Amino acid sequence: MDEKFETIEELCVLSDALFCKVNPVQVLGGQVFFDSIPAHEAAALLSNTQKRYQNSSLLECENVVDSIIHRMCDRDALRMRTSKLGQIHVFELLSDLIDAILLQQNGEVLCRYTHILHWRNLVQSVGEELPMTAMYAVKDLEWGQPPRERFAWDYVVRQNNEPLNQLLRRGISDHHMHLWASAPYFQVSWLNLMNGIANSPYLRNCARIDREDWSLERDWSLDGGQSPAQAARRGGSLVSLCQQAALIRVYLCARLKGLPLRLVGDKTDNLRFVMDLLHNPELLQMEIDHIQAEISSLRDPDGEFCMDYALRFFGPRDNRDPYQVFSGERWFLYSVLRDIFMTYHVLSRNEQNLFYAYLLLQIQIRVRMVQTDSKVGLDHFQKIQRRKWYFLGDPRSQELIMRLAVCEPLRRVPHLLELEVRVIPGDTAEQLRRNIAQLEHAVGGGGRPELPDGNDAENLLGRYYYVLHFTREADRAELSGFSRYGFEYRHYKFRKKLAKKGYAIQLFRERWPSLARRVRGIDVCSLEIGCRPEHFACVFRMLGAHSFGTDEFGAPRPLPRLRKTYHVGEDFLDLADGLRAVSEAVNFLNLDCGDRLGHALALCMDPWEWYQGKNRQISLPMQDYLDNVAWLHYMIRRRPFPGIEQALSFLESQFEYYFRRVYLNNINEAETERFVQSGESRYSEREFARNYKAHRCLFTMEDYIRAWMLRGDHPELYRSGYFWMDESLPDERLRFQVNEKLLADTSIRYIPECSFLNFSYHYNLQIRRTGAEYVTITVKDEYIRSVEAAQTALQFDIADRGLSVESNPTSNVKISSYAEHPITRLYNNGLVHTPDELRGCPQIPVSINTDDSGVFFTSLESEYAVIARSLETLRGTDGQPRYYRWEIYDWLDRIRKMGNDQSFQFDG
């Protein structure tokens, strides 16, 4: 690695340690000061908390810290400062780091493209606001500028690679963007918390987080410290942390502006009283109403609403700019940092140390609201991500989020051609109408003078549309009891809810066709584990075929078809399980040419690396493992693979063992015979079912996979133990209960073994109980070869169907690295040039998107940039770059065009 890059990496890691791992209690108690952290304690912190140094000795960490201190001393002349050997000044450390990563160009702070990956890591740990305000403070002082009064910059910094920027200016589209996670919700939440610290709903939700059974495994002090859960037990609850931060903030703001702050009646020694409150949570709680009154007096002195009292402390405000709302916090950070970097200070050293404690408190609170750790798993991510609703419940915050997530990106980035905004549908047509109308109202400005005017909103209208995404739920059915068969099929209540939502969407489209034209697609998101694509099959087929509404006179009016996309293959316990989920989504939901798959990581991850990363051990429900074995056998038999015979034999032996455990041990032969005889009797007058004959059922692997194909049908059709359609039901309802597209031979439904196995899968409680038991499997080479072959077959099947994959680099980087992002295994045209390399790749149309840009502190342009830079850093075995820059840009340009072409608006 280049020495300069190594140095910046060390600065990033040490900054993470000093801003994220130091216990604020030690700072408030005076044991730690921002400008004199001993080198040996910083080294111990590196050794104890940083993955980069987990295999390094304490002496090696001390050498790293000493080298950083010496480099800081070497820069003293440039920065007009005097660094001390053996000690670290955390803000001077930060200034040296940002000076290497950022630059100022035409008055705007940009990220140096060559260091965009370092910047991404820094932002992930401390956020953008601190380093950005530090950069502006440093540069303004360097150029002798007076204190700035404008702080309304974008919350995602741009980079300075002009050739790449020129490529992106040709037009880009974001077709995978969740609305409420695509704005800086922590920043908005923080303002709500800092302005309402006494008996507010936001504080009550902090207490709710404290009550939740969740803790984060990390150290918070220089000497080993405590986890947040341990801090809570010692009185450091999230409520207390927020109140401490709010007290420090209002005190320092008043000091910076020379305003009287009446915290102690007529006394003037506010600092001592503030320190007493910070050291005594009980006393702080007693005074909290008084402190809130001071905040309120600063916030609304003239009765006019202001989201943040700090906005009152500097220059003219431009209320038309939604980024203005963050200016108060930025002014506060900038002003204190500027004071710290100046020779003559307004704040005392103790007060400046309070600012360091404020930052530590803020970051400690942030890790409870935003995923900043490296823990893998969609369940962990969603547990934290859903907390945004705790702090954004008021209408003003929701309107602000809509403007920040949709309006501003479209207004500020003219080459952002299109946004696909994903929202959760309501339970009724009226709820859905109201929700969409409110979102449209927010974009249109609602007639408020500070919001976009009508012409502006009209121009934006054609550049975004909505996709309704259903959310998954686990099956909570009660499987206890002595009866072998139950009356409810799998996910019974959840399927009923889905059907209700589906009919509501139909009714919404029929009653309000003009507004319904703003909705162009449907999707499914959230945890995959425990909720398979089969549960969404009927509602997807129904909505995908819906095409007519009515006008104001009751006449039929054609509507654009609802296109389909589906989050799949993103979260799984077995790579084979993720691949099977992709196959089920395609086949059961009838995804067709032009439809999309969201994430689909299972399609493009290296099976050998994935299983090795799991130490060749997988743990999953027995039913899922049995399904995976049968599906793998089916997939690799469809497409010839050389040398796969041994793998087939292995799968057959696994199937025989687990099929007996899950099914045969829980099926009564006499009962089975009665079901089959009942079917024969009922079918006696049905010509199309003449092949259905009662006989002793001998179940084979072929029967099992055929029964798996029937899972795309509605389970109600198999309630009797065989397939039966109630002809008294209207055709419109029956039409979508049967999956017509998967089966080339519909007579499979009338094979007793197949229909009975599907019936047993849904209604046999003993099978469901046994199948739900977890098994731990040691993965053998034959299994991995099977997965590898099935993955290849599925990749080319997806390509042949004309489906596309929505890639979200930062969202999925915890699964892989940027450089080895699996998108290149789906599409490599432009990166490679030999016929074998090109034909060996399925060349599936892919796109680059943001997913949850507010969660991952990214933008669409930044997503392209991190992928480009990561590919540039790859080296071949000879040490030379694996790809030329022109190859990378050619490949990205092709992806850019494909992303634009994947719009759901093209149906008219």
Region locations from a protein language model:
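Metal-cofactor-binding active-site regions of metalloenzymes
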Residues: 1-908
